[in-house]
């Protein structure tokens, strides 16, 4: 794969935490014309074990700004835009995503994950989803009209957030693994090559060293399989 000939375009990265750091680091080696990073959070001491682009000197700074600085230092000729905002509605996400080739959801909450899913369904753009908690991770690539989405799999977000990295912890190296795999999915979409994780949920059990691609079947009644512009239930 030649970086000089690959016709890549922009990427929207939602979330600048552990997954977002790993994704951004992996993408920095690609000839992407622009990267948009959206996150409203600031760097805390408890983040450093898994958010590998941050140091003690960065405490209190915005995560999105710090990743942009690191990314820009490696690729100063590329465009990096930061949004100090939490994109947690389909409308807010779609407004930014429609200008990019691929959207990557590296968020850490169900509201944003399903908002990204619903925006992708409604506006028909490709979405890479990933999550990690404790010693387990998961990965799914969504192509509305062609593959299953989060609502096909889970129906909708839970009523409460429940287990999070803040209250349950997460293995830093697992976050890195999931983030790099998310970047690899974005590469497949941008280069239009390989076999993205359409209709397959990749699960990772770090404790047992197991990966499993679980086959998925799209829900024929889900909005992702209906006409463009359809709204999720």
Predicted regions and their residues:
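Adenine nucleotide-associated cytosolic modules
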Residues: 1-233
């Amino acid at each position: 794969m030649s970086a000089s000939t690959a016709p890549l375009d922009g990427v929207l990265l939602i979330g600048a935490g552990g997954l977002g750091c790993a994704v951004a680091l992996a993408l920095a080696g690609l000839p992407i014309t622009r990267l948009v990073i959206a996150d409203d959070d600031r760097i805390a001491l408890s983040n450093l074990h898994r958010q590998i682009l941050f140091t003690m000197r960065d405490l209190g700074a915005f995560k999105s700004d710090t990743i942009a600085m690191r990314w820009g230092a490696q690729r100063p000729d590329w465009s990096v835009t930061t949004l100090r905002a939490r994109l947690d509605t389909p409308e807010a996400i779609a407004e930014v995503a429609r200008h990019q080739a691929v959207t990557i959801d590296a968020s850490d909450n169900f509201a944003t994950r399903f908002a990204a899913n619903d925006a992708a369904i409604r506006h028909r753009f490709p979405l890479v989803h990933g999550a990690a908690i404790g010693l387990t991770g998961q990965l799914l690539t969504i192509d509305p009209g062609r593959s299953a989405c989060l609502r096909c799999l889970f129906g909708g977000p839970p009523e409460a957030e429940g287990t999070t990295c803040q209250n349950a912890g997460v293995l830093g190296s697992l976050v890195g693994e999931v983030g790099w795999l998310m970047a690899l999915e974005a590469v497949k979409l941008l280069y239009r090559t390989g076999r993205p994780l359409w209709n397959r949920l990749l699960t990772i059990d770090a404790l047992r060293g197991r990966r499993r691609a679980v086959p998925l079947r799209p829900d024929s009644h889900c909005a992702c399989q209906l006409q463009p512009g359809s709204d999720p239930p």
